[in-house]
């Protein structure tokens, strides 16, 4: 492997900004903000909007927002049904 071309890979704490859930993972991302983890060490903190803790696919709480379809629009326009 060539030296000096690979990014620094280190432990980072990710926090879900909508639920407050935190998890420790390895990443090349870095932050000036740090947080003390359960093991007593301080790690960089990266805030993210969506994680598996808040994403509808993983939580099973999906919201189906469906606009009127073409058939419904046609029926409304011509007074059918």
Curated annotation (Swiss-Prot):
Lineage: superkingdom: Bacteria
Quaternary assembly? Part of the 50S ribosomal subunit.
Q: Does the keyword Ribosomal protein apply?
A: yes
Give the protein's recorded name: Large ribosomal subunit protein bL31B
Q: Which residues cross the membrane?
A: none
Q: Which UniProt keywords apply?
A: Ribonucleoprotein, Ribosomal protein
NCBIfam families given for it?
A: L31 (TIGR00105), PRK01678.1 (NF002462)
């Amino acid at each position: 492997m060539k030296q000096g071309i690979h990014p620094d890979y280190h432990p980072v704490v990710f926090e879900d900004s909508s639920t407050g859930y935190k998890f420790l993972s390895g990443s090349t991302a870095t932050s000036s903000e740090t947080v003390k983890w359960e093991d007593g060490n301080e790690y960089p903190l990266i805030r993210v909007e969506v994680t598996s803790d808040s994403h509808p696919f993983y939580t099973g709480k999906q919201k189906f927002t469906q606009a009127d379809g073409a058939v419904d629009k046609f029926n409304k326009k011509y007074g059918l049904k």
